[in-house]
């Protein structure tokens, strides 16, 4: 009994990153040795992702409502600079993708089988979807994981309770801490969950289907790597005026790795919240900025939309001038911000961008099909970049505001 308790204590107090690394290696080994065994442990990954997705909506709703209700008068949340960073970062990602596409032109061997899906017809439809998600029924928003609606109702309830009695505010604060404790427990199960995810992914997909699109994949991953390791650190340095890499690597290690394997920004919200708490950021700020970032901070999506659209243009022999490429960057940036409002995310927004070049919907949907083929890596890298950047920009804005206050004191 004592040995079992000792093992559980080591699991609870050990390095989560090292445990995740062990889970990844074990998953690859199991998938290599036995495909059937790997498929049989797939449920561990599904359980982990399911638990994260289940707790995330209530976590966001309670944290946002509690933080706004308990916010001190005249308290600064630094939301404006964070939103500016989110939007600028997304546009910078689209520009990076354009430059990578010009430097390494990509063409696609398009097939006749296009993915069966209904892409949005235009930016107006994306905005329409987002606006109606804003006024969604709060119960339905919690059930379906509509974070735009959850944010709206959480902010509304928080503002309504801002003038409530202290005892009412304390109840919400206590519930918030209780939900946070549940999140910490779920996150400690990450090594087991990622073991299941890696095992099933390698066993079912492997890399045979991806090999034919290696050039496209390298351009996509190269653009995301430049964004993560050069552009984002440069933006952070501009804000905090010190070496940005310790912060950047911490966020990639503790947020990006988990997001890479869960492939869900929504599922990674609890992980990001816990990381923000570990970094000692203001709860009033990160309780709003993290779920908001999961909705509008879509640098990875902007890269995917831009590179696949330009690959389609190259394949069809369309000449793309620099002004059209800049326009594509703007459209990709705006579309990416609405990716969470579209079923299928960034891939189904490709036809919208392709329409800029007069590329037919049939061809555009074949490009989407290519996206689904490489999605096992593309979607993972995209989510890892998107989710880790949420914490990076939130931390940078908080530190910049703190430095400014200290300088003025």
Curated annotation (Swiss-Prot):
Pfam families: SDF
Compartment annotation: Cell inner membrane
Catalysed reaction, written as an equation: L-serine(in) + Na(+)(in) = L-serine(out) + Na(+)(out); L-threonine(in) + Na(+)(in) = L-threonine(out) + Na(+)(out)
Chief location bin: membrane
Segments traversing the membrane: 14-34, 48-68, 82-102, 141-161, 192-212, 216-236, 290-310, 322-342, 357-377
GO BP of this protein: serine transport; threonine transport
MF GO annotations: neutral L-amino acid:sodium symporter activity
Gene Ontology annotations for the cellular component aspect, listed alphabetically: plasma membrane
Membrane topology: Multi-pass membrane protein
Keyword Transmembrane tagged: yes
Alphabetical UniProt keywords: Amino-acid transport, Cell inner membrane, Cell membrane, Membrane, Symport, Transmembrane, Transmembrane helix, Transport
Function: Involved in the import of serine and threonine into the cell, with the concomitant import of sodium (symport system).
Family statement: Belongs to the dicarboxylate/amino acid:cation symporter (DAACS) (TC 2.A.23) family.
NCBIfam families: PRK13628.1
Protein name: Serine/threonine transporter SstT
């Amino acid at each position: 009994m004592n040995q079992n308790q000792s093992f559980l204590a080591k699991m609870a107090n050990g390095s989560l990153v090292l445990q995740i690394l062990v889970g990844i290696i074990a998953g690859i080994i199991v998938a290599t040795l036995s495909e059937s065994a790997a498929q049989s442990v797939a449920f561990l990954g599904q359980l982990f992702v399911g638990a994260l997705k289940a707790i995330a909506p209530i976590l966001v709703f309670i944290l946002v409502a509690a933080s706004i209700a308990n916010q001190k008068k005249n308290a600064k949340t630094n939301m404006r600079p964070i939103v500016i960073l989110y939007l600028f970062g997304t546009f910078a990602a689209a520009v990076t993708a354009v430059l990578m596409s010009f430097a390494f032109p990509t063409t696609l061997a398009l097939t006749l089988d296009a993915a069966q899906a209904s892409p949005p017809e235009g930016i107006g439809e994306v905005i329409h979807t987002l606006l109606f998600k804003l006024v969604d029924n709060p119960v339905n928003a919690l059930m379906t994981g509509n974070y735009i609606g959850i944010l709206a109702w959480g902010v509304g309830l928080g503002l309504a309770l801002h003038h409530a009695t202290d005892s009412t505010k304390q109840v919400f604060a206590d519930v918030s801490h209780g939900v946070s404790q549940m999140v910490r427990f779920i996150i400690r199960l990450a090594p087991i969950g990622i073991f299941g995810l890696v095992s099933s992914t390698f066993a079912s997909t492997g890399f045979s289907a991806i090999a034919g699109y290696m050039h496209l994949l390298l351009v996509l991953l190269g653009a995301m790597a430049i964004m993560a390791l050069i552009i984002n650190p440069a933006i952070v340095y501009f804000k905090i005026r010190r070496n940005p890499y310790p912060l950047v690597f911490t966020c990639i290690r503790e947020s990006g790795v988990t997001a890479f394997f869960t492939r869900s920004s929504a599922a990674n919200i609890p992980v990001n919240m816990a990381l923000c708490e570990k970094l000692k950021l203001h709860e009033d700020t990160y309780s709003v900025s993290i779920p908001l970032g999961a909705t509008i901070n879509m640098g990875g999506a902007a890269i995917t939309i831009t590179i696949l659209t330009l690959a389609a243009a190259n394949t069809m022999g369309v000449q793309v001038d620099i002004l059209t490429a800049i326009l594509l960057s703007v459209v990709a940036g705006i579309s990416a911000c609405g990716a969470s409002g579209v079923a299928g995310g960034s891939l189904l927004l490709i036809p919208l961008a392709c329409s800029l070049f007069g590329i037919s919907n049939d061809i555009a949907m074949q490009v989407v099909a290519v996206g689904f083929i490489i999605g096992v890596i593309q979607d993972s890298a995209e989510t890892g970049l998107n989710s880790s950047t949420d914490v990076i920009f939130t931390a940078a804005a908080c530190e910049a505001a703190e430095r400014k206050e200290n300088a003025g004191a």
